[in-house]
A protein has these predicted regions:
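Structured catalytic-domain cores with a bias toward divalent-metal coordination
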Residues: 1-283
């Protein structure tokens, strides 16, 4: 927690809600190091490792110590329930005692999950001016107009009248130093623009892709999938996206784009189970 000696906004920066999304964690840690010794107005709180049980297991989920409990997606149970299961109680304790009381604004740092990649990608509820403002200051490749879903930390913040965004910092599990630096610079832009720290906002690149609809192309069957597109490619309806092979290397499936859209995610691990993500599109 960085408490300023001058009045200002209180911003909460979280990471590690999903334990295998390490670029978000590394971004939060880097940001904290770079804030050391700076003049601060208001208060900046950084929680870099929300889901320690998942981080220890390289797992997306929250894992209970109780032998009769199943793992849970922590980012689907906020604000939690003090009388619920252990994941719900944990989320509620965090929300009521740390996350909500210390925030006028919030940024939740993630990455794509293991096996797939994202660009620098922001979720923002366009009904909230501060959410749009923060998302564009991040200088991402993509912004999704995201009204939110129940249980997601960003949504719970927004519904509590605390403007929030989610930032996806590239690939799942594996370290991407360039993406971490971009995300750190983006969060610093937010801090500067809201006058929590001194300095000028880094000039923004040309406008990013902003969309309202996500289309996910998923594996029809198990096998090995090779993608033929890259992140941020603009694809046409009917364009080939990926080819799938069986255990013997025989071609068994071809995947095509159902719409004209921009590629924002694709698998980076070839083994795909039925229903696993192959390519994700935004338009």
């Amino acid at each position: 927690m960085f408490k300023g000696d001058k009045p200002g906004k209180r911003i909460m920066i979280t990471a590690g809600v999903h334990g295998d999304e390490q670029n978000g964690i590394l971004t939060a840690q880097k940001l904290a190091r770079e804030l050391e010794g700076q003049s601060i107005s208001g208060c900046i709180t950084i929680v870099p490792t929300v889901n320690l049980s998942g981080i220890a297991r390289h797992s997306r989920d929250f894992h209970s110590a109780a032998p009769d409990s199943s793992s849970a997606n922590l980012n689907r149970v906020f604000p939690g329930n003090p009388n619920g299961d252990d994941a719900s109680r944990y989320a509620n304790s965090l929300w009521e005692n740390l996350l909500k009381p210390n925030a006028d604004l919030a940024i939740d740092l993630h990455s794509q999950t293991s096996g797939s990649a994202y660009p620098l990608y922001a979720f923002a509820d366009y009904r909230l001016d501060d959410s749009i403002r923060m998302a564009r200051l991040i200088n991402p490749d993509v912004i999704l107009n995201d009204p939110g879903d129940p249980g997601i930390l960003e949504t719970v913040y927004n519904r509590a009248d605390i403007p929030s965004i989610t930032i996806e910092v590239g690939i799942g599990r594996y370290t991407d130093l360039e993406m971490i630096q971009r995300a750190t610079t983006g969060v610093q832009n937010v801090l500067k623009d809201y006058q929590l720290i001194e300095g000028d906002v880094v000039d923004l690149d040309p406008p990013c892709v902003e969309g309202e609809r996500i289309t996910s192309v998923r594996a029809e069957q198990g096998g090995f999938v090779i993608c033929h597109v890259e992140l941020m490619d603009l694809v046409e309806a009917g364009q080939k996206l990926a080819t799938q092979y069986n255990s013997f290397g025989d071609e068994i499936q071809t995947y095509y784009s159902p719409i004209k859209a921009t590629v924002i995610s694709h698998n980076v691990e070839s083994v795909r189970a039925p229903g696993s993500l192959v390519v994700r599109l935004i338009d």
